[in-house]
């Protein structure tokens, strides 16, 4: 954990190396959207990647991450999501401390995610996959 903290320099944050836009993430091959919201939040607004065949989504509430970490594949690009990026930042650091190397925070919260999942964009993706 010490080394992770030492790497979190102004250069690191200034270049945005810790975050990724939803649009960029959805173009990645073999990605996983890790939704760290509570079960209640995920039940209210669910995020499914049915038409983004290169990306799967999984909801593991932040308080369950330590017990369910084996459900998160280390070989995939992991994008951590929560509405305000507070929980995402905590899980981001935790995953790095557990040996995950390709982890980012989805920037922009709900608004950026819903923008990337608007009907015209989902239609485009679904037509490209057929």
What are these regions (language model features)?
Residues 29, 53-55, 99:
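Short, structured coil segments at secondary-structure junctions
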Residues 45-63:
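A short alpha/beta connector and helix-capping loop motif
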Residues 1-50, 122-130:
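Flexible, polar/low-complexity N-terminal or interdomain linker segments that lie immediately upstream
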Residues 60-114:
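Catalytic cysteine-centered active loop of the rhodanese-like fold, especially the PTP/DSP P-loop
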Residues 105-130:
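Cysteine-dependent PTP/DSP-like catalytic domain, specifically the C-terminal lobe
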Residues 46-50, 74, 93-97, 118-121:
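Short, glycine/charged-enriched secondary-structure capping and boundary segments
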Residues 19, 33, 54-59, 103-105:
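Conserved beta-strand scaffold positions in the cores of enzyme catalytic domains, especially
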């Amino acid at each position: 954990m010490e080394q992770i903290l030492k790497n979190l320099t102004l250069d690191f944050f200034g270049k945005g190396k810790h975050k990724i836009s939803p649009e960029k993430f959805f173009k990645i091959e073999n990605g996983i959207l890790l939704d760290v919201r509570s079960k209640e939040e995920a039940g209210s607004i669910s995020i499914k990647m049915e038409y983004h065949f290169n990306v799967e989504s999984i909801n593991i509430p932040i308080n369950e991450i330590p017990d369910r970490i084996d459900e998160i594949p280390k070989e995939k690009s992991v994008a951590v999501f929560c509405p305000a990026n507070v929980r995402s930042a905590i899980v981001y650091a935790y995953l790095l401390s557990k040996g995950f190397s390709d982890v980012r925070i989805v920037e922009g919260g709900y608004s950026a995610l819903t923008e990337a999942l608007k009907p015209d964009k989902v239609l485009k993706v679904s037509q490209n996959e057929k």
